[in-house]
Design a protein with these regions (language model features):
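A conserved catalytic-core segment of Leloir-type glycosyltransferases
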Residues: 48-136
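N-terminal subdomain of nucleotide-sugar transferases
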Residues: 1-84
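Alpha-helix C-cap/termination motif
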Residues: 38, 136-137
């Protein structure tokens, strides 16, 4: 029996975790769903922005994947990994979380549609967090 092929999806935004239903958010959900239904093993990652309600979306921390520190701009930042499922699509979403970078922010822009000044650091943290987590999966 052959092992299933594996695909890693990494996205900044996936519906339904960010409220507004946009074409890109739907696509970022539908692609993993499509490949999963065709026998591929998929893993999907996104940042755990502050507007994502942990209780409503049933996120829980994955202790065995959390707990390392990533150094960004000479500062240690703890990496927290949370997971939730989209039941109707039968896919799991892994969330990269850190209070400094994601906790109080809705996305990559503020309420006035201005990009946050540390978006570069946040993106680096997110990318490195995905890579470190994939090593442990």
């Amino acid at each position: 029996m052959r092992e299933p092929k594996r695909i890693l999806f990494v996205s900044q935004q996936i519906f339904p975790y960010l409220d507004e239903e946009t074409p890109i958010r739907l696509q970022n959900r539908q692609l993993p769903e499509y490949f999963q239904s065709h026998g591929f093993e998929t893993r999907t990652f996104m940042p755990k922005f502050g507007e994502i309600n942990e209780r409503r979306n049933q996120l829980h921390e994955v202790i065995r994947l959390s707990g390392i520190n990533l150094i960004i701009s000479s500062t240690d930042h703890p990496l927290l990994i949370k997971v939730a499922s989209i039941q109707s699509a039968r896919i799991q979403i892994y969330f990269i979380d850190n209070d400094d970078y994601f906790h109080r922010r809705k996305g990559v822009v503020d309420a006035n549609a201005v990009e946050y000044k540390d978006n570069d650091e946040r993106t680096i943290f997110f990318a490195r967090g995905v890579l470190e987590t994939v090593k442990k999966l």
